Structures are given as C-alpha cells and as structure tokens.
Amino acid sequence: YIALLDHDDLLAPDALFEVVRCVNDNEKADVIYSDEDKITADSARRFEPHFKTDFNIELLRSNNYICHLFVVKRLIVEEIGGFRNDFDGAQDYDLILRCIEKAEGIYHIPKILYHWRVHQSSTAENPESKLYAYDAGKRAIEEHLKSVGRPGKVRELYYRGFYHVTYKVKEKTGVTVCFVGNNKTDVKKCMKSIKKTAGKVKCQFIAVKSIKEVKEEQIRYEYVLFVDSSIRMISKNWMREMIGICQFPENGVVGIQLINKKNQTIYHNGFLKGQKGYAFQGQPVEAVGYFHRDEL
C-alpha cells in the first residue's frame, strides 16, 4: 500500500494502525481514506475537523473531498502510471480519480487520522496561493469523465477548488411529471413554471391527489418526477441536470434543492438518514454550508 502525505503534515498516533485494521477486515480494500482536520504552523492548535461521507463519486467529481489521508494499493498506482506532470497542483486529485476507477473496494475510516498543516503559502490557509491548481483540478475531472465514458461539461464554481459537472443527456429523453395536490390553480402554476424552466425535455403531465393514485399504465416515459403542486421551478435546465445523474445505472433517485422564497432560506436539500427533518433546512440560500455541502 501507498499513503499520500505532505511533508509538513502530521499523522495521528494510531493512523497506520487504523489503516492496517481496515485492510485486515476487508480483503477488497483497494482504497482507504480517513477524516482530517487542520493544524497551525506551530502545532499549537487543531481546527476545522472534516468529517467526511462514505464514498460518493458525484461529490468527488465536485471537489477532492477525500484529500487526506489517502491510502491505495501499490499495484493500482503502478497500473495507472503514478502521478502525471500535466496535472501539477492537482496531481493528488488526478491520482485519486484514476485510482477510484480501478478500485474494487473503497473504504472510509470515520476518524480524524490526518492533520493538515496551515501556513500562508499552503492552499489550506490561502486558496489563492496556487491558482494553477484549480485549472489542473478541472482538467483532472474532465479526463476522468472521458476515461469512464460519461460525457459532461465541468465548470469552476465561485469558491476555489469546487466544480460542477453537467452530464450530457440523450436528446429524446422523456419525463412523466406527476403533480401531487388538490388545488387546480397550483397545478396550473406549477406546470407553467416547469414548461418555462425544464429545458428541451419531453414531458407528460399527470395530476393526482396522492402518490398512491399513480398507476403504472399511466406512465409513458422512462423517468418519473413527483412534485408537490405548490412548488414553483426557478432555475433553468434543472430537469436535464436531474436526468443527467439519474441516467446512470447506480443511481435510482435524484432530488433538488428547494428554497423558501419568502425568507430566502433552504427548505429542503435532501433527507438525513436516521434523523428527522431535511438537510440544511433554515440555512440562508447563499450559505455554502459545512465544507460547501450546501453549494454542492
């Protein structure tokens, strides 16, 4: 196995023990990563703990959330040819993406095992210190998408090191839209907002009082969208964005962010497993959230 570390960063005392335990417990552990935090130049203070999700490929295509500690089987690194000079500044991001493509098992250790050193010339403290790294990161994602055969456009977001992928969608894709609600006026207004913002997607519209009323024989298209009739769509091409992710065989359900227009807060940004309520509910619309999760 090979572990990636910056020369001035620190490992937790039990970091290698935890990695070896993961390897021993999981024979298919090709890639392993852990949580991390930051540490001041004088090692006096640790801060900004990053408690990461288990492996999430769409999140990884938006930001190198894996980062540190990253451990990979040596045979995989040899197979892909190691680092590539063309991606200097984001060579670890490029390597991680290529390793992920080959890995059979990807495991997350939910413990802080890595302390990222912060100083003025590091991206941990000053994202503007290595601007070339962000273009390299964008190119790394583009190369990854080509490698896995998933055409899409990558654009940089406002904050450095964060990206958005828009996947190519088949031109003749259709969606059956099921409006849920009793108010006919709401249904008409919701339908109007969808037609105005959905983009070039064929749509079939069905109105029902509850989801239970939808019958399989009514559904004409490959994808089904359930929408509360009180909702109004405002972003352009949101439907194609949803289909872009839903079209892949590993994905079955896709949601979008809902906002409260009256007070400009997030109403719904996904469900929280094991907890009541919705992710980031009540946060300001412009908030980026915990490690930019609101934004991504």
Regions found by a protein language model. Name each.
Residues Y1-L10, Y221-I234:
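Short beta-strand-to-loop acidic/aromatic patch adjacent to the donor-nucleotide binding site
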Residues Y1-S129, E143:
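Nucleotide-sugar donor-binding/catalytic module of glycosyltransferases
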Residues D14-R46, I231-Q275:
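Conserved donor NDP-sugar-binding/catalytic core segment of glycosyltransferases
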Residues A44-Y65, L272-L296:
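Short, flexible, basic/aromatic active-site loop/helix in glycosyltransferases
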Residues D94, G174-C178:
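Cell-envelope/extracellular polymer assembly enzymes that use nucleotide-activated donors
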Residues N126-G152:
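Catalytic core of nucleotide-sugar-dependent glycosyltransferases
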Residues K189-K202:
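Short, acidic, metal-binding catalytic loop of nucleotide-sugar glycosyltransferases
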Residues A207-R220:
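Active-site-proximal specificity loops/subdomain of glycosyltransferases
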